[in-house]
Amino acid sequence: MDKYTAVKRTFEENQDQENAVKMAKYMRDLFVFYGIPTPKRKKLYRDFLKGEGKNKTIDWGFLDRCYDDEHREFQYLVADYLSALN
């Protein structure tokens, strides 16, 4: 399973529809959300980012796929990924 699919599956398994509606409304329905609060979201991919940080190479293909996903959590992941590799 590729990185994008693994992260997507993790987000889908931890989604909260009630929070997703609230988050979308807060952002004036400009984005679709899984409804995962920031602390939980960051915890879900903490180990993944640690592993990526050891590579010392940015996987731009992975980041492009994440950023193109309609769910806002993926765009947050891109920012956190780049910060972790900085």
Labelled PLM ranges:
Residues 1-86:
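Surface-facing alpha-helical segments and adjacent helix-coil boundary elements at the starts of domains
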